[in-house]
Amino acid sequence: MGTFSVRHLDLFYGDFQALKNISIQLPERQITALIGPSGCGKSTFLKTLNRMNDLVPSCHIEGQVLLDEQDIYSSKFNLNQLRKRVGMVFQQPNPFAMSIYDNVAYGPRTHGIRDKKQLDALVEKSLKGAAIWEEVKDDLKKSAMSLSGGQQQRLCIARALAVEPDILLMDEPTSALDPISTLKIEDLIQQLKKDYTIIIVTHNMQQASRISDKTAFFLTGEICEFGDTVDVFTNPKDQRTEDYISGRFG
């Protein structure tokens, strides 16, 4: 399983309301793209799905974020389990300053796996899942910092996969990459949806239209429109959506 249901979510930074009455169902094993102009709330919303906003002292939320019908903001919800089930890939590749192997093994070790055979199998499976195994299999002891930007981002995806999550959150994962590396990541994302629910923030509307099944358009902290990507881009119901995707603003 791996389905998020968000109900009447409001998020505040002090007195400033960054998200307003967000209600959305994010379907399992599909790619949902979050689009909208800078400052519209899409990255803030993404971070509510694994409670990264907890790190901001002035932040508080109202409403519910349900993962398979369990409220992740409930005091009874296990935060470590949330981090295991919901992986995160950031805009800038952020490998740890350690070997390729240790980058991928880091998460499983944190969750208590120490057996070398089990770790070896997880590392290989994760690197294969991130479509980078063939490029690094003979250099697993090499520093991750020596990889190219595109390889580092795929390594970060492998690191997220290694804890065997149900859901992957991606915050503009290709914005710092060249076009060839971007294409590899896009192909990889489409392969990953067979096994994972994927929610991706992107400023690149062409990317959203290429790879996603569903699209949510954010504006000033609200969702103006959510639906099948083909419908949002070819027959939007909200004039603001049409204005944005046609380039009239943003």
UniProtKB/Swiss-Prot annotation:
GO terms for biological process: phosphate ion transmembrane transport. It is an enzyme of class 7 (translocase). Belongs to the ABC transporter superfamily. Phosphate importer (TC 3.A.1.7) family. It comes from Streptococcus pneumoniae serotype 4 (strain ATCC BAA-334 / TIGR4). Pfam families: ABC_tran (PF00005). Its EC number is 7.3.2.1. The keyword Translocase applies. One of its GO terms (molecular function) is ATPase-coupled phosphate ion transmembrane transporter activity. SUPFAM superfamilies: P-loop containing nucleoside triphosphate hydrolases (SSF52540). ATP binds at G36, P37, S38, G39, C40, G41, K42, S43. InterPro entries: AAA+_ATPase, ABC_transporter-like_ATP-bd, ABC_transporter-like_CS, P-loop_NTPase, PstB-like. Residues 4-245 form the ABC transporter domain. This is Phosphate import ATP-binding protein PstB 3. Part of the ABC transporter complex PstSACB involved in phosphate import. Responsible for energy coupling to the transport system. The complex is composed of two ATP-binding proteins (PstB), two transmembrane proteins (PstC and PstA) and a solute-binding protein (PstS). Coiled coil: none annotated. It catalyses: phosphate(out) + ATP + H2O = ADP + 2 phosphate(in) + H(+). GO terms for cellular component: plasma membrane. Keywords: ATP-binding, Cell membrane, Membrane, Nucleotide-binding, Phosphate transport, Translocase, Transport. Its main location: membrane. It is found in: Cell membrane.
